[in-house]
Amino acid sequence: MAVTKLVLLRHGESEWNRENRFTGWTDVELSEKGRQEALAAGRLLKAQGFSFDIAYTSVLKRAIHTLWHVLDKLDQPWLPVEKSWKLNERHYGALQGLNKAETAQQYGDEQVKLWRRAFAITPPALTPDDPRYPGHDPRYAALSADELPLTESLATTIERVIPYWQQQIAPRISAGERIIIAAHGNSLRALVKHLDHLSEGEIVELNIPTGVPLVYEFDKNMRPLHHYYLGDATEIAARQSAVANQGKAG
């Protein structure tokens, strides 16, 4: 049976991941730990014999720089890269920049978990005059006001991620191209929900760790056969637990 592989990679730890802050569309740098995670992911993919025909990422530098580090370790810095805002992290509205633990102390662990992980619940929205509104950012100048979020749930994130997947990425995988997507926790959760047909309840508990390659294998009809993380299982579980605990008051 012909098998085509896709690699999903959440960016390495960012400075705001390290500070336990809601990030969303805020364009923050990788932390030093995040850079090392990205380099390690590239080395691991190289050791496992992976190479790619094209890469996809968001327009946020923590994902872009993660991809750069990976492609450098794969000796594929020349690889074609498609960048799209549709692969951006979910927009966290007025929560962007706030510390997650402090927000949990104010509103409670359960409310913050719902804001972070529930399927259709949106955080408090920005207003268009807020400096954090993406309409003030030149990289989104070509987008209409209807396309620019004031806040997003996972459900509304899916509304931009899955059409992009279906129109731009899936046909290339179906044609046999080897693809890596370097993106974000929630844009990747949106894609995983679609690929694995997860329920709204199941997606709440899904945590994607930073800097760990997630491999999907598809048959010729683009049906996922199975998926698996590359790396040490104990370390991967620890990173998933760390993601889950970010929104707790402590």
From Swiss-Prot:
Species lineage: Bacteria, Pseudomonadati, Pseudomonadota, Gammaproteobacteria, Enterobacterales
Pathway(s) it belongs to: Carbohydrate degradation; glycolysis; pyruvate from D-glyceraldehyde 3-phosphate: step 3/5
A GO biological process held by the record: glycolytic process
Assembly and interaction partners: Homodimer.
Catalytic activity, reaction form: (2R)-2-phosphoglycerate = (2R)-3-phosphoglycerate
Disulfide bond residue pairs: none
Binding-site positions, substrate: 10-17, 23-24, 62, 89-92, 100, 116-117, 185-186
HAMAP family: PGAM_GpmA (MF_01039)
Keyword list, A-Z: Gluconeogenesis, Glycolysis, Isomerase
Record keyword Isomerase present: yes
Organism of provenance: Edwardsiella ictaluri (strain 93-146)
Active site: H11 (tele-phosphohistidine intermediate), E89 (proton donor/acceptor)
Its EC number(s): 5.4.2.11
InterPro entries in UniProt: His_Pase_superF_clade-1, His_PPase_superfam, PG/BPGM_mutase_AS, Phosphogly_mut1
Protein name: 2,3-bisphosphoglycerate-dependent phosphoglycerate mutase
PANTHER family xrefs: PHOSPHOGLYCERATE MUTASE
A GO molecular-function annotation: phosphoglycerate mutase activity
Annotated function: Catalyzes the interconversion of 2-phosphoglycerate and 3-phosphoglycerate.
Pfam family, one: His_Phos_1
